[in-house]
Amino acid sequence: MDADDSRAPKGSLRKFLEHLSGAGKAIGVLTSGGDAQGMNAAVRAVVRMGIYVGAKVCFIYEGYQGMVDGGSNIAEADWESVSSILQVGGTIIGSARCQAFRTREGRLKAACNLLQRGITNLCVIGGDGSLTGANLFRKEWSGLLEELARNGQIDKEAVQKYAYLNVVGMVGSIDNDFCGTDMTIGTDSALHRIIEVVDAIMTTAQSHQRTFVLEVMGRHCGYLALVSALACGADWVFLPESPPEEGWEEQMCVKLSENRARKKRLNIIIVAEGAIDTQNKPITSEKIKELVVTQLGYDTRVTILGHVQRGGTPSAFDRILASRMGVEAVIALLEATPDTPACVVSLNGNHAVRLPLMECVQMTQDVQKAMDERRFQDAVRLRGRSFAGNLNTYKRLAIKLPDDQIPKTNCNVAVINVGAPAAGMNAAVRSAVRVGIADGHRMLAIYDGFDGFAKGQIKEIGWTDVGGWTGQGGSILGTKRVLPGKYLEEIATQMRTHSINALLIIGGFEAYLGLLELSAAREKHEEFCVPMVMVPATVSNNVPGSDFSIGADTALNTITDTCDRIKQSASGTKRRVFIIETMGGYCGYLANMGGLAAGADAAYIFEEPFDIRDLQSSVEHLTEKMKTTIQRGLVLRNESCSENYTTDFIYQLYSEEGKGVFDCRKNVLGHMQQGGAPSPFDRNFGTKISARAMEWITAKLKETRGRGKKFTTDDSVCVLGISKRNVIFQPVAELKKQTDFEHRIPKEQWWLKLRPLMKILAKYKASYDVSDSGQLEHVQPWSV
């Protein structure tokens, strides 16, 4: 599918939420199967969006069991009943495995209970089993109604009035085992738990020179194991979809001993709980420990993470994902017709899509069938593009071929960090260095940005030099905001001295400006006529050409965690409003998305101009809120959203206007947003996007092999980014037109579309464009 195949219609054809009404409709929301962090955010979004459009929304407690039992298990929800649940793990409405719903009698009871409350729209949050059950229920619905009418439990009018059941699913599962969706609700939070444990284990393992075998959950899906192995640079990983080849025991022991010989003091082996060999026999953690102890004599420990992975606070990513999906689910139910198949709302790249539920379920079952029949390549293919990409990247970075097996290109590729530090930069450098070495290049590290480049702070960097960099925050190479413009002569001299054939720049808006300056200097300095590519890395997420930047997710999690603590403080004090200032320069990404993830009442950003009337409206909104049971407020403000409406001004205005109703406090989060260990998302995004950048450089250098060609075309100076569903290389010359240089932001930003969501979920009226919604797509199998 192309990135553009669901563009919003133009002009009068645009469709807004106001055009959809839920009046007279009743929506039932339930969570079923294993719990997952973020389910509460989804429940909150469904309830609030449902109420916003005028529908009645009911909680169905304890999953399908509550639907079968009826009575107090089905209760109407109101706005306040989903307050303060965003930051809570698990599901507040409970989940239970239900045998009764598997029988027709059970489903008959469930139908009767729903009809008593007029519910003909179901929003099911759960795994493939729960969603398959919902689809069967929908198919049987008319038959169940007729049976209830024959039994005298409902009249003929009710059969006609409630003739159709609409079902929309959201996949809540930490395993990420549902085909058709890139990320299921809960997966990112589970990765956070795993990486927290791995980071903690690494310190003790290094102290004692130990080997740790970590078993992670995921049933028959290796996603958690694979991505956590990628995020922590594990020595070996065992997956159900890609079993190790015959003789793996010896290969693994050789790999572990080689790593020890390179002065690595610890080994990490990650095992998926469903790991198997090529004969479909289980590979257990204990078996691996036994092997390492007997063959190598290493001090080895096994850690089984278990249900820790299901627990804890949802990550910012899961809260935003679940909120987006919950809103999309309500819109899908409002737009459903009797002919619409049951669908799943999901994420494809950065794009919300609807997919036919049974197509997804079928493909998910096909993966298991392929594994049972030992067609492992098919299993990886069916898991999708993201899974296959992660697997290939892991293999490239984990296993170093002997030097004599790597064909040398005689090319020197330099890596530089530019701008402010961002968590994940080191993961990106590690990935670039290792992929470059595997491709036969000589890799050079430039220290301290363009300043260091001009001074000749350049050294060769090897495979082992970047070991253990993935989990390190900040920038090990050192980074500065200095632009190359005033050092062009010196930098050209260094390019010539070190025979640099290509340049990879990892950084923020300064890196983008630097790339433009180097590109413009090509006519004067032929040394710059080499392939140059930039990978966006900044907490501000303000680089043109990419929807995401390395470091923004970690900053968002820092903001979200801090807001959770502040909200807790405000809840204890009662009648208190907090004003939080976030970073980002003129870019409101952190304030807006932080507001969505933390459940803020307002977020002031530069991209949406505001005046004193808007501030007054916010005060009135908070005054009304204090009359309810939720007696606290949270307001986010981007640091450069307004020259005059500063954080101090807003604090003073709120303090004065709120006198006698609420008091006010302010917090400036500052540079804590740039620090800390990178989140799993930033580690993996940095790792994968940097590997892609090096593949591009290698392909460009192959064009010139032996010919000494100079690169002068625009397509040899690019920014690599994610746009909607695709990873794309865009020439900086083209991106100039899309850039607001004065305010250092792109002219168009995708996340502004989500701005109304934050307002709606905070009880403001807002105009939400739903033109992109409504296209039911088909699941596309991907070929490896």
Curated annotation (Swiss-Prot):
Co-factor(s): Mg(2+)
Amino-acid positions noted as binding Mg(2+) in the UniProt annotation, renumbered to this chain: 128
Region (N-terminal catalytic PFK domain 1): 1-399
EC number(s) given by UniProt: 2.7.1.11
Interdomain linker as annotated region, ranges: 400-411
Enzyme's top EC category: transferase
Residues modified as N-acetylmethionine: 1
Compartment list: Cytoplasm
Region (C-terminal regulatory PFK domain 2): 412-784
Keyword ATP-binding: yes
PTM-bearing positions, type N6-acetyllysine: 395, 486, 688
Residue numbers annotated as active site: 175 (proton acceptor)
Chief place where the protein resides: cytoplasm
Pathway membership, UniProt: Carbohydrate degradation; glycolysis; D-glyceraldehyde 3-phosphate and glycerone phosphate from D-glucose: step 3/4
Domain of life: Eukaryota
Residues the record lists as Phosphotyrosine modifications: 651
Binding site for substrate: 173-175, 210, 217-219, 273, 301, 307-310
Xref: SUPFAM superfamilies: Phosphofructokinase
Subunit structure: Homo- and heterotetramers. Phosphofructokinase (PFK) enzyme functions as a tetramer composed of different combinations of 3 types of subunits, called PFKM (M), PFKL (L) and PFKP (P). The composition of the PFK tetramer differs according to the tissue type it is present in. The kinetic and regulatory properties of the tetrameric enzyme are dependent on the subunit composition, hence can vary across tissues. Interacts with ATG4B; promoting phosphorylation of ATG4B.
Function in brief: Catalyzes the phosphorylation of D-fructose 6-phosphate to fructose 1,6-bisphosphate by ATP, the first committing step of glycolysis.
Family: Belongs to the phosphofructokinase type A (PFKA) family. ATP-dependent PFK group I subfamily. Eukaryotic two domain clade 'E' sub-subfamily.
PANTHER family: ATP-DEPENDENT 6-PHOSPHOFRUCTOKINASE, PLATELET TYPE, PHOSPHOFRUCTOKINASE
Protein name: ATP-dependent 6-phosphofructokinase, platelet type
Gene: PFKP
